[in-house]
C-alpha cells in the first residue's frame, strides 16, 4: 500500500555534493514553474549562490537559514544551536502546509546526528507532508531510522578530493 504522504529523498555520506544535488532538483522544479522551499539547518552564511538566488526569483523560491553566525564546527554546539534547529523544524512544518513541489531540509541529517532534534518528531512530521510535496533531506551521518523511512536514499562518497584545491565561488558555494 502506498502511503498518502510526500516522497522522501535522502542524501547522506561523507562526500561533498549533497546540498548541490538538492539544489539541482530545486533548479529543475523552478524550471517547470513549481515552488521550492529550502530550510538550512546549522547554516548562516549568506554569501552562497543558493542564498543570493532568492533575489533573482523571489516568487517561487524561498530559502531560510537557521544557524548561529560564525558557527563552523560540531565541537562547540550550544543550546542556541538546538533552539535554531527547533525553529528550522517548525518553519518546515509551516511551509509544508503550503504544499510546495519541493521542500529541502538541508543538513537535517547532521542536526539529528548531533542530537539537536528528536528523530521521532522528525519522522512524525515527514508522515504528515502532503503527497504533492517532495522532501529532500541532506547531511552526513543520517540516522538509520531515517534511512529506513525515506523512499530514495543516495550515499555520496569522495573518490578524489584534493584539499590543496581551494573552493570556488559559484561551484562549491
Identify the residue ranges that each predicted region occupies.
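A short helix-to-beta-strand connector/capping loop
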Residues: 58-62, 100, 131-133
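Conserved P-loop
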Residues: 2, 6-95
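Generic detector of well-ordered alpha-helical packing
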Residues: 41, 107-108
Amino acid at each position: 500500500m502506498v502511503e498518502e504522504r510526500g516522497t522522501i529523498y535522502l542524501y547522506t555520506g561523507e562526500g561533498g555534493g549533497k546540498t548541490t544535488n538538492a539544489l539541482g532538483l530545486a533548479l529543475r522544479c523552478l524550471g517547470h514553474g513549481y515552488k521550492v522551499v529550502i530550510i538550512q539547518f546549522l547554516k548562516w552564511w549568506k554569501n552562497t549562490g543558493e542564498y543570493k538566488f532568492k533575489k533573482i526569483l523571489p516568487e517561487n523560491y524561498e530559502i531560510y537559514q537557521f544557524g548561529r553566525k560564525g558557527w563552523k564546527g560540531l565541537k562547540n554546539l550550544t543550546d542556541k544551536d538546538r533552539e535554531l534547529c527547533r525553529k528550522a523544524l517548525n518553519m518546515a512544518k509551516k511551509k509544508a502546509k503550503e504544499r510546495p513541489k519541493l521542500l529541502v531540509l538541508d543538513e537535517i541529517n547532521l542536526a539529528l546526528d548531533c542530537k539537536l532534534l528528536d528523530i521521532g518528531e522528525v519522522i512524525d512530521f515527514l508522515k504528515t507532508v502532503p503527497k504533492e510535496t517532495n522532501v529532500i533531506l541532506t547531511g552526513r551521518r543520517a540516522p538509520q531510522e531515517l534511512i529506513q523511512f525515506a523512499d530514495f536514499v543516495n550515499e555520496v562518497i569522495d573518490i578524489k578530493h584534493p584539499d590543496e584545491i581551494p573552493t570556488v565561488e559559484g561551484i562549491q558555494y
